[in-house]
């Protein structure tokens, strides 16, 4: 099902069939206060005994990215299946959020505002997940935030990306070299914005604990591979977040 090469896994489209603990049908629609105005948000409710809370950030808004993106939705469903309350929001200028697109700079502040809201609402350890642009702007502030315990980069854009300028933008991820939190990177093996060689080179420089999963046959948008994406996130959460937290509780380190 999963082929291992060091810490890198390659999936070939077979089902993991993990049992979910909880999946909420309760969705709260609201606005949270951001640094550039109100941010449109959705919260999928968690279980009463939730152990973590999570936020999932969407891809580039100038190319149609919103909180309703399919990859964002499936990532949310994976996290919510463990009973975690999961927040999605539209960056400034996207959807009906206030403000204007800020080329990734102000959007990092939006991530901080979302983390603050999530912390104030639930007072739980947090998990950050971001897809594409969402990963590019959200991983840095999440690495620096002690309240965030685990990170998920989906389709992390390590290659040049045509953005809102004439020159394609290359995002930098050097900060990950100092990030010792639990980390999952999951991408399509044919990701046109995250070339495999560059992603593996970055992964080699990132400290443990970490995991890289490449889904065979998948492109940047995981077309036809969304189930595998969801199952990959579920498997990692079960292994790296749930089991790890339980072990720490038993040892008294939490």
Describe every region a protein language model picked out.
Residues 130-138:
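Gly/Ala-rich beta-loop-alpha elbow adjacent to hydrolase catalytic centers
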Residues 2, 12-49:
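N-terminal cap/lid segment of alpha/beta-hydrolase-fold proteins
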Residues 205-221:
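Catalytic histidine neighborhood in serine/cysteine hydrolases
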Residues 189-194, 220-221:
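Acidic catalytic loop of the alpha/beta-hydrolase fold
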Residues 47-88:
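Short, surface-exposed "cap/lid" segments of acyl-processing enzymes
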Residues 101-121:
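Alpha/beta-hydrolase active-site loop
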Residues 179, 185-187, 191:
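Short beta-strand/loop motif that positions the catalytic acidic residue
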Residues 218-230:
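Catalytic histidine-centered segment of alpha/beta-hydrolase-like enzymes
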């Amino acid at each position: 099902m999963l082929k291992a090469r060091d810490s890198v896994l390659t999936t070939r489209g077979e089902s993991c069939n993990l049992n979910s603990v909880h999946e909420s049908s309760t969705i709260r629609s609201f606005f949270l206060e951001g640094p550039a105005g109100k941010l449109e948000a959705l919260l999928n409710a968690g279980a009463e005994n939730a152990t973590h809370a999570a936020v999932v950030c969407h891809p580039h808004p100038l190319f149609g990215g919103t909180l309703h993106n399919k990859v964002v939705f499936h990532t949310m469903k994976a996290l919510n299946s463990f009973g975690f309350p999961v927040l999605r929001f539209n960056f400034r200028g996207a959807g009906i959020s206030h403000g204007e697109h800020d080329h990734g700079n102000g959007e990092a502040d939006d991530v901080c505002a979302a983390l603050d809201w999530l912390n104030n609402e639930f007072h739980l350890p947090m998990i950050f997940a971001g897809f594409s642009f969402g990963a590019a702007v959200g991983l840095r502030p999440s690495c620096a935030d002690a309240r965030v315990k685990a990170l998920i980069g989906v389709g992390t854009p390590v290659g040049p990306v045509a953005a809102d300028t004439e020159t394609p933008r290359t995002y930098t991820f050097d900060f990950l070299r100092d990030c010792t939190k639990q980390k999952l990177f999951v991408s399509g093996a044919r990701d046109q914005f995250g070339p495999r060689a560059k992603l593996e080179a970055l992964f080699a420089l990132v400290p443990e604990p970490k995991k890289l999963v490449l889904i065979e046959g998948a492109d940047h948008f995981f077309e036809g591979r969304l189930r595998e994406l969801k199952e990959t996130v579920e498997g990692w959460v079960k292994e790296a977040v749930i089991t790890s937290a339980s072990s720490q509780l038993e040892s008294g380190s939490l």
